[in-house]
């Protein structure tokens, strides 16, 4: 039986990546909140990843 989470790095980046966040007003709000809070990673694009990305 197939479960819900079928990880794909491309889909993850396109949905939650920096460019996706910057594309909408709400996404820019998300980024500003995370900057204000002092998050180490603003988006999934900031993760330290291997060659697959």
Curated annotation (Swiss-Prot):
Start and end residues of each stretch annotated as Disordered: 23-53
GO terms, molecular function: structural constituent of ribosome
Biased composition annotated in UniProt, kind: Basic and acidic residues: 44-53
Recorded superkingdom: Bacteria
Keyword Membrane among UniProt keywords: no
Pfam family, one: Ribosomal_L34
InterPro entries with a match to the protein in the record: Ribosomal_bL34 (IPR000271), Ribosomal_bL34_CS (IPR020939)
Biased composition (Basic residues): 30-40
Keywords: Ribonucleoprotein, Ribosomal protein
GO BP of this protein: translation
GO cellular component: ribonucleoprotein complex; ribosome
Family membership noted in the UniProt record: Belongs to the bacterial ribosomal protein bL34 family.
Record NCBIfam families: rpmH_bact (TIGR01030)
Protein name (database record): Large ribosomal subunit protein bL34
Organism from which the protein derives: Leptospira interrogans serogroup Icterohaemorrhagiae serovar Lai (strain 56601)
